[in-house]
A protein has these predicted regions:
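Conserved pre-motif I regulatory segment
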Residues: 1-39
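Conserved Helicase C-terminal RecA-like lobe
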Residues: 9, 36-37, 43, 51-60, ...
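Conserved helicase ATPase motor motifs in RecA-like P-loop NTPase domains
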Residues: 44, 151-164
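Conserved Walker A/P-loop ATP-binding site and its immediately adjacent core
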Residues: 62-82, 311-314
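Conserved helix-turn-beta segment of the N-terminal RecA-like "Helicase ATP-binding" lobe
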Residues: 72-93, 175-178
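Inter-lobe coupling linker of SF2 helicases/translocases
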Residues: 105-110, 116-120, 140-150, 155, ...
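SF2 helicase motor core recognition
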Residues: 112-116, 163-165, 316-320, 360-378, ...
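A conserved SF2-helicase RecA2
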Residues: 387-396, 400-478
Length: 481
């Protein structure tokens, strides 16, 4: 068997990566008559980027369109430049870079905003990094990519199935496969055997620390205004669901509860914005249980390099204030940030962490849950849960991935109890349901180290979250140019 080229002098592929590169080359050279490509679905942290660059440098074609989330564009550009691959970047409605570029880098949202430029040619290869971004076939993002033509097509995603069979069908549709509606599960299972390559991170168990330790911080209200308001909000949500209100209305009520759980003032500010400042007067004067619990974690350890995941921007500000008060140097990754600002924050946090300065990175979970290498942060705190288990898995592996040398601890702040019909606990129940469907489709898609929390007293007493919430979800768009 002939040797494969490495991206640059001094680089060497790990054994599983060489297998992956050869599999990708074989798929492009022979295919199956329908698709010269496939889905590289290795666990997060196994090096899908470098395997893809291995394909690019060993199987040369004319022009490759590489689509990625904004947070990953600079990471791709650096890796490709280091490998001697000439790139062009789409910015300000045109391609910027060498005319003889081999790889054209663009974000998902810029594809659908500039469809004429993206579809005026048949690309020699199209690569979707974090390809699960097109899982919802109804979105502009998915519809636009379905119109982009390519002789070879690749999906890179550690979580190609997040909500169910429709996710996988959309990816197969993009690759060119037709899946029948009758017997769809069996058809998808059969295709997954050939079109999808998946290896678990346990392959690297001998060169990585032990799996992350998950610590669940279960918090209970002590009564008072916070307790009473929470119950009122949960009651409204349950009433709306029982009455079969429109999903958009239910989603809004659900988000209001999430805001209140994060910090009551976030909820009050949101309601005042909606009603022109007339809904509440004055700031919240009561307790903020979850923020108090976060402060307690920092009281116990105000030194460990820490990664905190949040949902709301104001929530991130409260977390930042608490961390700063404990002596942390704080950095952000959130929707709307430019690539240069994001890159600077990550590099500075790495530099300071190496110097022994306490650093804390706050990530908005849908903006910083995929692709980033943040191994220097060894304590992960989920300030709030997310209803999509794959988002949680992606987020956790920003820290626990190949190259991590230290033990990683993950904290989950779970507010409430069964008696309070806790929202966060119900999310974890929904996680179990979604994961079981994913494993049914393809057993190898099981992520090795996600937490399986028991939910005591859940039997029918908790809220049942609507299954169509994911249809409402939107990742942050690119910064406005």
């Amino acid at each position: 068997m002939s040797a494969i080229n490495v991206p640059y002098t001094g680089f060497s592929f790990l054994p599983h990566q060489e297998v992956g590169v050869r599999w990708m080359i074989d798929r492009e050279m022979s295919g199956d008559g329908i698709c010269r490509g496939g889905i590289l679905a290795d666990d997060m942290g196994l090096g899908k980027t470098w395997q893809t660059i291995g394909l690019l440098t060993n199987c040369l074609v004319g022009k490759t369109l590489l689509v990625a989330p904004p947070v990953l564009i600079s990471q791709w550009q650096e890796a490709l430049d280091k490998s001697g691959v000439i790139t062009a970047l789409f910015w300000d409605k045109k391609w910027k870079g060498a005319e003889d570029a081999a790889v054209y880098l663009v974000t998902y949202d810029k594809v659908w905003r500039n469809m004429k430029l993206m579809t005026e040619r048949v690309w020699d290869r199209v690569v979707l990094d974090e390809g699960h971004f097109i899982r919802n076939a109804k979105t502009k993002r998915a519809q636009s990519l379905l119109q982009v033509r390519g002789d070879r097509k690749w999906v890179l995603s550690g979580t190609p199935v997040q909500n169910g069979l429709s996710d996988f069908r959309t990816l197969l549709d993009w690759l060119g496969y037709e899946v029948p509606r009758i017997g769809a599960m069996a058809a998808c299972q059969e295709l997954a055997k050939t079109v999808l390559l998946r290896r678990p991170i346990t392959l690297l168990a001998n060169v990585m620390p032990a799996p992350p330790t998950h610590e669940k911080e279960t918090l209970v209200y002590d009564g008072g205004a916070e307790f009473n308001t929470f119950n009122v909000l949960v009651g409204r949500l349950q009433d709306a669901m029982s009455a079969n209100y429109p999903s958009a209305c239910i989603l809004e009520l659900y988000l209001r509860v999430q805001m209140f759980i994060s910090h009551p003032q976030i909820y009050r500010d949101a309601m005042n914005r909606k009603y022109g400042g007339s809904y509440f007067s004055g700031p919240w004067q009561g307790t903020a249980t979850k923020l108090a619990a976060f402060n307690t974690l920092l009281d116990v350890d105000s030194v460990s390099p820490t990664l905190v995941f949040c949902n709301f921007k104001l929530e991130m500000d409260y977390v930042a204030d608490a961390a700063t008060a404990h002596g942390y140097k704080v950095y952000f990754i959130r929707g709307g940030m430019g690539g240069a600002e994001r890159k600077h924050g990550i590099s500075e946090s790495i530099r300071l962490a190496k110097a022994g300065v306490p650093v804390l990175m706050i990530c908005q979970i849908v903006a910083g849950n995929c692709g980033l290498n943040l191994q220097h942060l060894t304590r992960v705190i989920f300030y709030t849960q997310h209803w999509n288990p794959s988002v949680m898995d992606q987020a956790m592996t920003r820290s626990y991935r190949y190259g991590q040398k230290s033990e990683v601890t993950v904290h989950h702040l779970i507010l409430g109890s069964p008696e309070l019909r806790n929202i966060d606990r119900c999310m974890l129940e929904k996680h179990a349901e979604k994961r079981s469907l994913t494993f049914m489709l393809c057993p190898s898609l099981k992520f090795a180290f996600h937490p399986d929390f028991a939910v005591p007293g859940a039997g029918g007493s908790g809220l049942l979250m609507p299954l169509n919430f994911e249809e409402q979800e939107q990742e942050p768009e690119d910064p406005v140019e």
